[in-house]
Amino acid sequence: AEMADALGDRAAADDYRAIFQRGKAWADEHLFNGEWYVQRIDLDDRSLVEAFVQAGDRLVQGGATLDAYWTEEHQEIKYQIGAGSSIDQILAQWHADIYGLGEIFDPEQVRSASAAIYRHNFIPEMGAVYNPCRIYCLNDEGGLVICAWPAGTRKPVIPAPYSQETMNGFEYAAASHMILLGLVAEGEECVAAIRRRYD
């Protein structure tokens, strides 16, 4: 909408703003669980993957879409977040804040989600955390994991790749957003933990 305004295309700008308002209202109502934003998906619904299967379907790895994204053994869609707390769940709002584009999500929900990222994704010492992927943080080092599944939430059997990892780009974005939202001590603690990993 901002770009359309800059180009003088008022009709397109109005259309884009209307689409945005509908999407914003839907996301705030349907994707916020009272504490953070989630991926709304039925992990057990094979038809969600089947919708992308086509005749002669082959992926780069040589398998078919259904083979790649459905586990017969567990009867579940692979590589999802579901009810987890994702480190980048409000990244769009961080970008909008930095660029002065305004509110993407409800401000109170954004602050709650940012606090949830600190509460659930920040691990002061990674030594007790199982990580089957790349090790960017270990033993007594701390950081924000890409996704966390707090007690009482369903963790997919085969979650989104790299969920248990820390990645400093994501971490710095989340930490700086915490600070921007007034969660200064939390954001600074995350930044200090990241910096200690590289000292």
Labelled PLM ranges:
Residues 1-4, 20, 24, 163-198:
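Extended amphipathic alpha-helical segments enriched in small hydrophobics
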Residues 1-10, 88, 92-105, 172-184:
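Well-ordered alpha-helical scaffold segments within catalytic/enzyme domains
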Residues 1-36, 105:
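Active-site neighborhood of glycoside hydrolase catalytic domains
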Residues 11-14, 108, 185-189:
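Short, solvent-exposed positions on alpha-helices
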Residues 12-15, 45, 65, 183:
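Serine/threonine-rich low-complexity intrinsically disordered regions
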Residues 13, 17, 83-86, 164, ...:
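Amphipathic, non-membrane alpha-helical segments in soluble helical-bundle scaffolds
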Residues 29-168, 189-198:
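Extended glycan-interaction surfaces of carbohydrate-active proteins
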